[in-house]
Amino acid sequence: MQDQAFKCVMEFTKKYNIDESHSLKHSMEVQRFAENIYVSELGLNPSLLTQKNIIIASAILHDMCDRKYVSDEATAIREMREYMAAFLTEGELDAIVSIITTMSYSKVKKNGYPDVGEYKLAYHIVREADLLAAYDIDRCIIYGMSVDKLAYSVAVERANVLFVDRVMKYRSDGLFVTEWSKAKSLELHNSSAI
């Protein structure tokens, strides 16, 4: 399943011209964070065992249907479902779509956490993994240069503002609910302080 999901990322990145700050390397990083959070939560929540494919696939695919990167979110979701259909059940695909279409920072800040039923912890694992990956200021710079065509110095300046206004507030905004993410975010927060 993971091989197919990463293949999907490579194909969608090319097809939709998704910049490198949200492509394969980012998907790999979010998947690694999600795997660590999953392992840390499994002992307390053994029901997660049946949701591992949902968590890992969501972590890998989370940006491939985002309206910031694709012109038609519904079409991208349909294509992703078709691409992954031989590797995941319809129920798993439904859960993945519910997670990846509601986990963005802006949606959470605006609407709070969605009701994803039995997948609540899976949702938080994937969402937190993506937030942890945001502690890389170079990704912000790359996004500014690639997508917004900013000069390096301007992209650095904007990235610094984004870090202060958003990333460095993740902890005080209470966006981490799992213990592993709380500890890792503190480590990343302290090493990323601007």
Model regions and ranges:
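Alpha-helix C-capping/helix-to-loop hinge sites
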Residues: 15-19, 37, 41, 64-67, ...
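Hydrophobic, well-structured mid-protein blocks that either form specific transmembrane helices
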Residues: 79-115
